[in-house]
Amino acid sequence: MSVTSEVESLLTTVSSLYVGNMPSTPDNCVCIYNTGGYPRSLSGTELEEPTFQIRVRNSSYSTGEALCNTINNLLHGHTTTKLLMIENQSGILDLGRDELNRQEWSMNYRCYFRQ
């Protein structure tokens, strides 16, 4: 299972959730992006240190901001059998409005992942 799939499984309560590509509709949605990470240690450990980004788009500022907080509470500090620790690296970043006047945010995370 990939890191993005593992993260997706933690966000089952989030509607309109996409992985790798945020479609132009619906207006209110969330997308998980794989953003690379850090090289595996040469010490022989099996742990990887991938990074990922969550982007949120919403037509309502207050609703979207609340969703960002909900997602961050679901992820930050969370541990599973494969994701040994998820850490928010950026807080909640306000990206402004897109060309259709929908508000956007991003949150960047780092984790330790065991295959």
Regions found by a protein language model. Name each.
Residues 1-9, 24-25, 37-49, 85-115:
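Short, charged interaction patches at domain edges and termini
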Residues 52:
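Residue-level detector of short, conserved catalytic/binding motifs and their immediate flanks
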Residues 59-62, 97:
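Short coil/turn segments at secondary-structure boundaries
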Residues 55-57, 112:
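Short hydrophobic/aromatic beta-strand micro-patches
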Residues 1-44, 62-73, 78-84:
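Small/polar-rich, solvent-exposed N-terminal microdomains that initiate assembly or binding
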